[in-house]
Amino acid sequence: MNKLNYLIPTLIAATSLSAYAEQSNAEETENTWADQQHKTVKQSLHSWSNNINDWLGETDQSKPASASLRVMMDMEWNRYSRFTYKPRVRGKIKLPVLKKHLSVVFGDEDIENQSRDKNRVGKNYENLERNRNYDAHQARNDNASMALRWSNAAKEFGVKTDFDVGLRSMGDIFGRLRISKKQEWTENFSTRLEQIYRYGSRSRHYLRTNLENRYIDSDSTFIMNHTFLQYTHNKEEETGWGNSLYRQHTFSGFKTLSYGIFTGGRFDKDRSKFNTWGPFVTYRQPILRKWLFIQPEISLYNDKDNNRGHYFNGFMRLEAVF
């Protein structure tokens, strides 16, 4: 019963916002204060990207620079960590004057590293005091990253590569390489393998492997099994793994519903190799405007390392896309 008391408010909030979004989308005017602010930010991004492009060399007016930006607020709640929230940003500026392969990326790179995870893995902060729900220092450091990216795709081999050189917070100069390959076995079944490695002068080693197997069972649904392996070596070495088996439904209006089972653990000494398992449900749709998204998620995981049985965890992401 106690678990239901924690879960019910989350369900009510998610359902109410979803219903309100349906009504508001129908009444969209595209002329409110929020719309004007969104337009202003987009125009500023466009202006900045073209100013940078012009400064770098002679430009082609038929191929202007472009920029994209995602601004997110991640909110999480459970009975142990209580409520936490974290602002996150991730952006990209394409610069045609530097050839089509080069761009500038900035913001929290974990948004890209974990973009293949359908469910929420991890938490907003590490080692956050129980009486706090926000860590300005950690949030600022995670978002303080900028790099020049060289991208290439070998179509004959189906391989895509990104190589970043940049600067993170605290003077952390880093290089990052991402290689991915997608193999279409049949019209309905495909495999995608992605390898990410980053080395920083302060953050040291980060290595992550993503493996996906996807089966399309209809025009609007597919079944996915996603496995990741992760290794970090900063002050200490940490290794972990996770596997999500889920089904996703795609609806009109950029709406998706996913549900499945997650398992995960650690390979480190004194840690459970099979630490967590449980079901999750996540939903995503525009709310109020086509550029504003809401993504609630409810999961029921355990935690053997901390002697915790299965408990409800609520997660909500509000995201503005520019």
Name every feature range the model reports, one short phrase each.
Residues 297, 308-322:
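Outer-membrane beta-barrel "beta-signal"
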Residues 92-95:
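Solvent-exposed N-terminal domain segments of exported/luminal and surface proteins
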Residues 75-87:
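Surface-exposed strand-loop-strand hairpins of Gram-negative outer-membrane beta-barrel proteins
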